Regions:
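C-terminal cap of thioredoxin/glutaredoxin-like
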Residues: 1-40, 168-242
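Juxtamembrane proline-rich low-complexity "stalk" or linker regions positioned immediately after a signal peptide
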Residues: 31-62
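Short, surface-exposed alpha-helical recognition segments that flank or form part
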Residues: 57-58, 91, 185
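A short beta-strand-turn-helix
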Residues: 63-80, 105
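A generic local structural motif
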Residues: 67-70, 99-100, 198-200
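Short clusters of hydrophobic/aromatic residues that line enzyme substrate/ligand-binding pockets
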Residues: 72-73, 157, 219
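Alpha-helix initiation/capping motif
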Residues: 75, 122-123, 160, 183, ...
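Structural alpha/beta surface segment adjacent to cysteine/selenocysteine redox centers
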Residues: 78, 83-89, 94-172, 177, ...
């Protein structure tokens, strides 16, 4: 019995040590990444290869003779233009949406917002159709209403095997002519509008979403995913214009 006692003690010590190590290796709640720490959703390719990132959009061959379809919200005399290249199915874009809404509310007189489509077709199966849904709504004067609904209800349709019925439901909720909406969502003009945005975005160096420009200059991702940082960047731009 005396010979077995040291062995039992040694085994007990080893078990305690292993348990302690396991607890140390388990990530704490504070160490888990939150959505704000998510990287932007990217195409996985470098769309700017061979291009001068400082060159104006007009000088880039891919954007030649293409007038981007611009959806604007805000005062026409606002001194700042904030442009978003977004994908309605992109989770970081969904996270950015309420941040942008707060910015619009706080800087109503100073900031005008523009949205450009950049659906990541190879990653998000419903993204391109969502972009067309927004454009079909735009033909009935309700682009921004559909834009907001798509982001705010992103989880409802993002992984749906067939998103069309969901989008038709949104059209009804917004009071759209559903028959016209159904025709427009698959029309060539609507598809071309989305592709025009993608082409111009690629020419500007966009490779992921959300990508945001403030008065023509790209805003770092770590800034746009933090309300206080984005607010400070806007205040700095406003001060520079005084």
């Amino acid at each position: 019995m005396r010979r077995k006692l040291p062995i039992i003690i040694i085994v007990g010590v080893l078990l305690v040590a292993l348990a302690g190590g396991a607890l140390m290796m388990r990530p704490s709640e504070s160490s888990r990444p939150n959505l704000a720490q998510m990287p932007p959703t990217t195409t996985g390719t470098d769309n700017t290869s061979g291009l001068n990132s400082n060159a104006p959009v007009a000088s880039r061959p891919a954007a030649a003779n293409i007038a981007p379809i611009v959806h604007l919200r805000g005062r026409a005399d606002a001194p700042l233009l904030l442009e978003e290249y977004g994908d309605f199915q992109c989770p970081p874009c969904g996270f950015f949406h309420p941040i942008l809404k707060r910015i619009e509310g706080e800087f109503e007189r100073e900031v005008r917002v523009s949205f450009h489509h950049y659906p990541l077709r190879n990653m998000h199966r419903n993204a391109a159709e969502a972009a067309r849904a927004a454009e079909a709504a735009a033909l009935q004067g309700k682009f921004w209403q559909m834009h907001d609904m798509l982001f705010e209800k992103q989880k409802e349709w993002s992984d749906a095997p067939a998103a069309r019925p969901v989008f038709l439901g949104y059209a009804r909720t917004l009071g759209l002519d559903v028959e016209k909406f159904t025709q427009d969502i698959d029309s060539t003009p609507v598809s071309n509008r989305v592709m025009n945005d993608e082409t111009v975005g690629t020419a500007r160096g966009v490779t992921g979403t959300p990508t945001v420009f403030l008065n023509g200059r790209e805003v770092p991702y770590e800034v746009i995913t933090n309300y206080d940082r984005l607010r400070a960047a806007i205040e700095s731009e406003i001060a520079a214009k005084k």
